[in-house]
């Protein structure tokens, strides 16, 4: 049980807690949750999700009580209770994404511009058909984020280890990477305060690698065709029934 947060030394926790195998919730220790909490909080910071930040602020008002309650529920492996802790009635938010205006053909033929953005907006509200787009974003509880980080610390890092160097997105922080790729010595970095590598670093590497490949192909007098795809609402259109498929 956690007695007093202000006396926790996270550096000592990391040296005492190496990456270990998951043997069941009954073997869970409070230090496992503290490390997972630290990573979850840092990961949320980089996402810049205001709603999630507010949840963490409220969680820390009674931190010791909240973390101990979660610890006890996990130790009992009470699945129904765990799910109720992780998902509440505010588990998603509709964030405004864009406003599109479809104006009539006659108006599109007029070559004029209004210098005031506010007046131009008022005119479009009056004369054009409006389509408002939003994006569904997860707004999970702090307990859900802790459980996610806990899963990564115990199990998820093993899946990440099997990915090739050609997988750039959302890779975990590791030690002793060789040319950005996992080796037998590149263990999951439990001591790092975040779970994932900063997005912009692998993105830049992915971009540069692609451009270099194109340049080399052109230098070799080869024909090159480059496709850059952004699938619209991909995750929102996945059929969750695939989970029930034995092949999956």
What do these predicted ranges mean?
Residues 2-248:
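Conserved two-metal-ion catalytic palm core of "right-hand" nucleic acid polymerases
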């Amino acid at each position: 049980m956690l007695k007093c947060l202000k006396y926790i030394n996270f550096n000592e926790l990391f040296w005492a807690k190496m990456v270990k195998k998951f043997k069941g919730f009954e073997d869970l220790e409070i230090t496992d949750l503290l490390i997972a909490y630290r990573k979850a909080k840092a990961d949320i910071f980089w996402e810049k999700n205001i709603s999630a930040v507010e949840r963490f602020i409220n969680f820390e008002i009674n931190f010791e009580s909240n973390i101990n309650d979660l610890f006890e529920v996990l130790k009992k492996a009470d699945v129904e209770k765990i799910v109720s802790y992780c998902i509440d009635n505010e588990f998603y938010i509709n964030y405004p994404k864009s406003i599109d205006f479809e104006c009539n053909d006659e108006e599109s033929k007029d070559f004029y511009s209004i210098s005031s953005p506010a007046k131009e907006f008022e005119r479009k509200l009056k004369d054009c058909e409006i389509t408002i787009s939003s994006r569904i974003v997860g707004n999970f509880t702090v307990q859900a984020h802790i459980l996610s980080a806990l899963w990564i610390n115990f199990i998820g890092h093993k899946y990440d280890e099997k990915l090739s160097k050609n997988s750039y997105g959302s890779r975990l922080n590791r030690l002793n990477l060789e040319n950005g790729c996992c080796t037998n010595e590149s263990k999951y970095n439990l001591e790092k305060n975040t779970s994932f590598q900063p997005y912009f670093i692998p993105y830049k590497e992915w971009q540069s690698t692609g451009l270099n490949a194109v340049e080399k192909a052109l230098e070799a007098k080869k024909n090159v065709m480059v496709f850059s795809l952004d699938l619209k609402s991909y995750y929102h259109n996945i059929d969750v029934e695939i989970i029930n498929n034995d092949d999956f």
